[in-house]
Structure formats: structure tokens, C-alpha cells
Amino acid sequence: MKIKINNKEYSFNKGDTVIQVADRNGIHIPRFCYHDKLSIAANCRMCLIEQVGINKPQPACSTPAQENQEYLTKSDLAISSQKNTMEFLLINHPLDCPVCDQGGMCELQDQALMHGRVKSRYAQEKRVVIDYNIGPLIKTNMTRCIHCTRCVRFGEEIAGIKEFGAIGRGEGLEIRTYLSAAINSPMSGNMIDICPVGALNASPSHMKGRTWELEEIKSVSAHDCIGSNINMHVFDNNVFRVVPRENEKINEIWISDRDRFSYEAIDHNDRIKKPIAKINGRHIEVEWDQAFEIIKEKLQNIDKKKSAGFISANSTVEEQYLFQKWLREIDINNIDYRVSQCNFENQDLEFYPQLDIPIREIENIKSLLLIDSNITYEQPILAYKIRKAFLKDAKINSISSYNYEYNFNTNNNLLVNPNSLSDTLIDIIEYLSHITSSDKKLKSFNIPEHVSKHFKGLTNKNIRDISNDLLGHNSLILLGSNLKNHPEFELLKVLVNIISILTKSNKGYLAENCNELGAWVTGCLPYKNEVISDSKNSGFNADDSIKAMLDCYIIYNLEFIDFYYNNELKNSLENAEFVLGIQSFVTEDDRSLYDVILPLATVFESPGTFINIENEWQNFEQGCTPHYMSKEGWKILTKLRLMHGKEISISHDYVDLLNEIDSIARKKKFSNSVQPHNIDIKKNLESFNLIRLGGVNTYYVDNIVRRAPSLNKVDSNKNIVRVNKNTLEKNNIDLTKNKVIVKQGDNKLLVELVIDENVSDNSIYIMNSNKEHFDLGKQYQQITIENV
């Protein structure tokens, strides 16, 4: 089909609007309300054009392209209409461009220059709009607002959380939150990007710099397993702000608030500025050479079989590769990145924690089963993809111990106690084994006896509905990242694998860190190096290394609260002969347990590579040179390898390091399936009267995010416990009081009580939002509650 624009013929597809055809062919049409990721509003009228044969101008954004029609974007009628619209928009717009954050990248400035009048005919006073506080992330200046409603539509359509709305009429119209509430969407910062004027600005960078002074540097998000592409805006060797970088395969044009504002942590008070060593019982700052000499001397006298190394799954591929390489060269095989995991049964069975399908294909799935995942806040970009699938009528179900609030609707929310999670999955397998027995392709798969012996012979309606939905074409099962703390994690992976076989579903584990696949590929595991699994030289896993009370511990880019057994770890470190930390940040309490701390550059100050959940290797650039006396991780680890006199093939050049890793690991293929016949079913989760639930707060997931001031102000009321009414009454809790005491072992905490029917029976939900919550005790363990 063909249309004419400005006397030239162009092809178009059915359903295209004129502005879409024009954009594809490089024809400029001004616009404010139109955005290709949002629905059409047609309320700014800036895109008015002439349709030949019609006397009135037409909005190009909402006018459907019609075959054999002719449109003019530069006729006298179109130009006059655009100038008139611009004049109306500028009537009330303040002339504060020199102090506006949007200055230099403002759509209104650009359009006014190209389509505005030279002189204004309006001489009256301009209106002024009150600025409401909508939270710590977005600074408003609503006098500049031109009512394009992009922010309103973003909340409704993309974030799935309707928080902004238009209140009033005419000149009194205001864009604001309902009841003057704060914005809580984990993707709210994207409204700053799509705002065409300076009405919505990033609070941390407000009034601190000009657009033309900034250098744009490509990078990758380091706070979830999606690997969103970002641009760092750098000025004077400081990250000034972070914005999305378009990548349609992964994050499209959006990023989470966690990715956008975490850069604030770079110069936090906990930042390690120089190497630190404990000398004569006191921690003092030393030079790099002195620190390396102390490390060399200490490691020479340590029993390597009684030493262990832990590295963050948020570290780069390069750091992970060099870390395990260095430790194995000095005969330390107790290496692990799985520090938040507590169940390591059958760990040497190959399990590559990747997604079976590309991220971009999630929006096309027909059915989804979420297992204990707070995905809206844990993985905001992935939740957006699922929301797109929901809007295409995908059937979504969840099984969890807490009914999380999603930005999409679900068919079934099956609420189960953590003790019953594996039993629920076995019930699904039992039902599926009956209804798939007539399928010739599935007949060859026999349910393992150690699974079938747990069949009960009864299934409820929710189990049947969830199972039937999965049997449809193109289904997906996702295991939430919080399950890594579950004592039956290995068993749950096996059961999910059986369900995926019976339903021909794709599956995936939502890793809690950005580079778990990198840690797996590079061999940061006790049973494999970067090339092969090697059970003969297998070392201790993280759990065993901590409980073994070893002589030496080396901790890379991890804080103690990142460990599942954090209290046990502290006890082991207190009794160790030597503890080395390679860290960007350290608290005063943690500092006392280290003998040497080397200052590590943050992810913003170092180049590197992350492997996301779909096995996409993504390189990123160094945003700024390391602050203070910190160094890039790959340089520190290369120095440590050279210091021990090993013959190494790697040079000091970063490119050579990339080539070495690429030749060894990049082309290897791995499986994320766990063979169900190899694992026995064991109930590792004890039956407690009360069991503790709760993942990690989305703004407390790693050592950078938890130090970003603005992010930590988002949810000010963090010290709360959630329990349902039935559980409270069974434990004789006074429902008229708003404070209770919770206890785990010898630790106790005074918290605010919230009665919440979304919590499963005999469970207490405490989100880990501060150090006190981590120190209280572990998830999925016994907890008690009592009156104050």
C-alpha cells in the first residue's frame, strides 16, 4: 500500500499512522505527546499536518495512513497550525531555560526554534503551579509542564502502576499524584527521560551540571540479571547521572530506578580510600606495595587446604576468571560465589543458571508460572516484559509463600507455607503425569520413583488450573531469586525440571546477581575451573568453608550480610589466622575482622563484561578513573598472580585478558537442566511453629545500591513485620498494639506490626532492609513473635 507525503510516494503497513510512516522515512514532524512506546493521546496538537482534500489540519500521530491519500507536512496550513500550537504552549511556559536541567536537550527548545514565532503576542502574567513532593527520586517543576501526559501513560501502560493523573480542567489542569502520595514504581525514573520539558528532573543531579558539559560512556547495569544497557554521563571524572541506552533485545529504552540512581554510592563514607592493614592490633592506611608484601608473607605461611575464597556474582567476568585462577595457582580450591545459598546437595551436577528463551521473547509467551518471585521489584525490566505478555492475554499463575503485588493480573495465586512448596510442585507433577500419559511423545519419560512415591492421589482446583495452563503452547516457568535461600533449593530445581519436561515448558532461574552466569563459566566453584569439572580436586562449598573454621579467608567484593551464614562467617573470621578483603566499601564493624583490605574500584570506575540471564556477553567501558587510591579489580588480581611468581601467559594488557577468556569460555555450551533421576527427595526444611519469610529489599541488594542515599529514602518505613490475623491469634498477639518483638535464636528486634493476609499461615514476613534484619537470623528458619 502506498501514500504520498510532500509529493513523494511511500509504502506503509495496515494500521500505520502518518507519523509512523514519516518517521520510518526520515520526514520530520514535530510532536510532544506522541511517543512510539506509548498509546496515542493526540492532545498536544503539535503534529498537525495537512491532508489533501480536507480543510482542517489533522494530527499526524492519530491519523491512519490511507491508500492513495496525500499528506503535506510543510504546507502553509501545516506550518501555520504548528506555529499557533507552539504559541499556545509557550503562553504559560516560564523563560527559565538557563537554570533548567533540561536545557540543551529539551524538545520544547528544539521545536520552538524550528516552529515557534519570533515574537510573542501574550503580555499577561504567566500561571504558577505548586510543586508537590512525589518522593526522593524525581524533582518536580510543574509550572513547566505542557500536559503531554506521557508520564501518566507511562505509569498506566509501562510500569503498570497508575500513580500520576490529570486533575482539573483547562488552565487549572495539573499533573500530579493521587492524594499527594509519593511515586513508588521501581521504574519511575523513566518518566524523567520521556518528559519533553523540564517538569520532571532527576533529584540527585538537579541543578548540578549542564548537558553539553557531560561525556556519554556506554555501560551495563550491575544490579540484576537482565543486564540493562545504560549510558553514564560523566563530568570532571565523576558520574553525573545514568540514563537508559536503547537495546530492543533487552531493556528497550527503559531502566529500573535501581540502575539509574545507584551511582550516588561511589563516594559514600564507607568507601575505602587507601589499602588498610592491621599492624600491632591497629588498622592503619598503608601504601599498595606494603599491603602486597604483607599479603605475600601471610599467604606463604598459610595451609592452602585450610583456606577459602569467596567472590561476588556482581563482579565482572574478568575479575571472576582471575580470582579463581590466582587461588588455584596457589593451591586453594575452596572457591565459591554462591554465598547466599544454603543447600548444596548434588552441586556437581551441571546446572547453568540461564533462561531457556531470549528476554525479548518473554512478551510472546502464552502461559507463565512464577514460583516465589517478587518479580515487579526484584526484576523490574523482566516484569515489564511479562506485563506485555499479560496485555496479549497470557495466562499467568503464581505459587508463593507471600502474595506479592504484581504489575499484571494473575489467574491463580496459590499461597503455600514454605514447608509445602516442594509438595505443591509434586502435586502438579502427579496431575500432569495422568493427563499426559496419552501423549506418545511424553510416554517415554517415566516419573522417577523417588518422586512418584510422594503422590497423594488428590489434587485441588488451583493445581489443575495451573497445570492445564502450562500445557498450552509456549509456556514458561520462572524460579524466583529468593529461593536460593531455601533449604530445598536443589530439590525445587529438580521438580521444576520435571514439570518443564511434562509440559514442554521453557524454564529459568532469576539470579539475584548480575553475573552469576559469569561466575559459573569462569569456574568460581569448588568443583570446576574455567575449563572442566574436576571432582578430584574439589574443594569446600561456601557453607562448608564457613563452618570448617579455616585458617585463611579471602573475600572479594562481598559484605558479610551478603552471606546466608553471615553470623557464622563472622565467628570463623574472628578465629582465622589471616583475612584478606578486596572491597570497595567496608563498615566500621566489618573492618575489625580484616587483616588487610585492598581498595577496589566500583563497577562505574572499571571496564568489564557481564553475562546476563540469556547468556548474552556484554562488554562495558570505564566510566571514570578509580577514585582515591582504589584500583581496577583485574589489575589487583594480576598483581597478586605475578607476586606469587607463577608462570602466566597473560600480559598486563586488558585486551589480552579479554582474548584469553574469550578463547576458553565464550563458545562453550552448558545446560540448565538437572537430571531428575540423579537426586533423591529429602525434606531439608524443618517444620517450625513459625517460619521466617522475606527477601532482600530491592534497594538493599548489593554493596552499591544499599549506599545510594536517594534510593534508601524511597521506602522510609522499612522496620515492619507482616503476619496474617490467624497466625497472630494463634500466638496470642494483642492486635490492638502496633509494636511486637520478634526473636531468632539469641537475637531479637522491636518492629512495627502490620496485619497482612497476603502472608501464608504460620509465617512471619520481614523484608531484609537493613543490617539489623540480616543479623536477626536467616530466612526459612524458626522465628517467634511476642507482645511488647
Segments the model singles out, each with a brief description of its role:
Residues 344-348, 407-409, 423-429, 519, ...:
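Short, charged, surface-exposed secondary-structure boundary motifs
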Residues 474-546, 693:
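A glycine-rich, hydrophobic/aromatic-adjacent loop/helix-cap motif
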